[in-house]
């Protein structure tokens, strides 16, 4: 297959996905193209539509030209897109937002225009409609609502960075890394910007609604916060001056949020419930499971930890508090997982009462094991520090983690709660003590 069109989609089946796909089928020579739709977190009629679309492709004789991917959890733009790229077979990968609609044109014109720069420029790796500046990155980038990327770019620099969550910034980073690897990012048509610099016109037959998913408050309630946090991530990597300017007035004392939760502040910073000493933390990697709003992680920052991985299961607390609280500090990495005995599952986390244990109602969150957490983050050190405060899941995490993995931690801080495991054998704290000493 020469071209693969990858479309990530999150709900909005009738108003976005359907018209997007209808236009592709109408104005594209499908004999040269495969369509890959990566559905994630959809609770509308997307599944039924994809089933009917498969039947349509079968009837047209293009059964092998449609691939669909389904994930119950909302993965975010980068991850959902990467899932599509992984199964795509084309030499050229077209990334297309579901809120972009082809306009009337000669069949296949849009493909030819995107492919044009590849034919005249051997260094071209990415073609796009819009290339503009990113202030946080201090670099130009292609806006990924529609781009064509040669497979050799992915082969050399990898897929989109999934650290940007919902989205915003992954396209900038990908373009920067592609250029550093020797590729060029090329606009496929000339454009003319409006006087205010917000709109442009050009000779390309497409209409882009513009962030139709992330601007839906029912799907992404805090897009402004997410975009700012992702901008800081970019600046940390590529434009230190922007990062330092934006975060210069955010010292740790301000970030402790005493008025938000004075109990947690006092517990960690003044009472020092865990009995933490600087010498135990300094220059070590800390795994903070049950980070809540980030107070323990910030204490570790003050004690000069090398890196702190702040893991919080509750999506609301993670988005609204933890990420913002640790934002200015490069040594604190916030992660939204439910650490458990298994990984790769999706569980529901209750957003109430400050609890972070796995429950039967609430937001869907992906599970991860302690071992996989270390592997995924390339943590190879053996003098690690572990902190556990996860409302009863501490027992499951420790008892179902291999002993050789546990022994990589020199120090374990743990707040014990009632064990949620129904097996009475696993409810005895002495069993934990025996296990750790084994």
Language model regions located:
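Short, acidic, metal-binding catalytic loop of nucleotide-sugar glycosyltransferases
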Residues: 22-32
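Short beta-strand/loop segment that forms part of the nucleotide-sugar
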Residues: 32-42, 67-71
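A conserved acidic beta->alpha catalytic loop
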Residues: 39-49, 341
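Glycine-rich, basic loop-to-helix element that forms the pyrophosphate-binding segment
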Residues: 70-88, 140-141
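Short aromatic/hydrophobic "clamp" motif used to bind/position activated sugar donors
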Residues: 93
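Conserved donor NDP-sugar-binding/catalytic core segment of glycosyltransferases
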Residues: 101-139
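Phosphate/nucleotide-binding beta-alpha loop and adjacent structural elements of enzyme active sites
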Residues: 242-438
């Amino acid at each position: 297959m020469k071209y693969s069109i990858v479309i990530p989609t999150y709900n909005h089946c009738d108003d976005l996905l359907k018209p997007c796909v209808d236009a592709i089928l109408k104005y594209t020579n499908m004999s040269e193209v495969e369509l890959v739709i990566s559905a994630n977190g959809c609770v509308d009629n997307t599944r039924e539509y994809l089933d009917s679309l498969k039947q349509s492709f079968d009837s047209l004789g293009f059964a092998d030209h449609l691939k669909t991917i389904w994930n119950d959890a909302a993965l975010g733009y980068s991850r959902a897109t990467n899932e599509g790229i992984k199964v795509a077979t084309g030499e050229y990968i077209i990334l297309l937002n579901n809120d972009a609609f082809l306009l009337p044109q000669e069949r296949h014109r849009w493909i030819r225009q995107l492919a044009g720069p590849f034919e005249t420029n051997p260094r071209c790796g990415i073609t796009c409609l819009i290339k503009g500046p990113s202030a946080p990155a201090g670099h130009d980038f292609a806006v990924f609502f529609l781009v064509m990327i040669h497979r050799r770019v992915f082969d050399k620099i990898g897929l989109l960075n999934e650290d940007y969550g919902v989205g915003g910034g992954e396209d900038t980073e990908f373009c920067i890394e592609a250029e550093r690897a020797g590729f060029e990012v090329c606009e496929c048509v000339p454009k003319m910007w409006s006087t205010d610099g917000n709109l442009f016109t050009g000779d390309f037959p497409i209409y882009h609604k513009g962030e139709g998913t992330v601007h839906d408050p029912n799907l992404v309630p805090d897009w402004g916060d997410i975009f700012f946090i992702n901008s800081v991530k970019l600046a940390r990597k590529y434009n230190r001056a922007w990062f330092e300017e934006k975060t210069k007035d955010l010292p740790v004392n301000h970030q402790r949020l005493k008025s938000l939760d004075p109990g947690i502040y006092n517990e960690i910073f003044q009472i020092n419930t865990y009995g933490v000493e600087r010498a135990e933390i300094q220059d070590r990697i800390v795994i903070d499971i049950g980070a809540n709003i980030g107070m323990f992680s910030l204490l570790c920052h003050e004690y000069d930890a090398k890196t702190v991985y702040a893991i919080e299961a509750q999506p609301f607390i993670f988005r609204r508090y933890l990420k913002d609280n640790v934002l200015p500090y490069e040594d604190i990495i916030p992660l939204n997982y439910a650490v458990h005995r298994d990984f790769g599952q999706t569980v529901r986390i209750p957003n109430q009462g400050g609890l972070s244990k796995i429950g039967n109602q609430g937001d869907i969150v992906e599970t991860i094991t302690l071992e996989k957490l270390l592997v995924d983050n390339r943590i190879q050190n053996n003098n690690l520090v572990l902190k556990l405060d996860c409302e009863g899941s501490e027992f499951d995490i420790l008892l179902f983690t291999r002993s050789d993995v546990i022994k990589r931690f020199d120090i374990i801080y743990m707040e014990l709660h009632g064990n949620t495991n129904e097996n009475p054998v696993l409810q005895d704290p002495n069993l934990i003590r025996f296990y750790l000493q084994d």
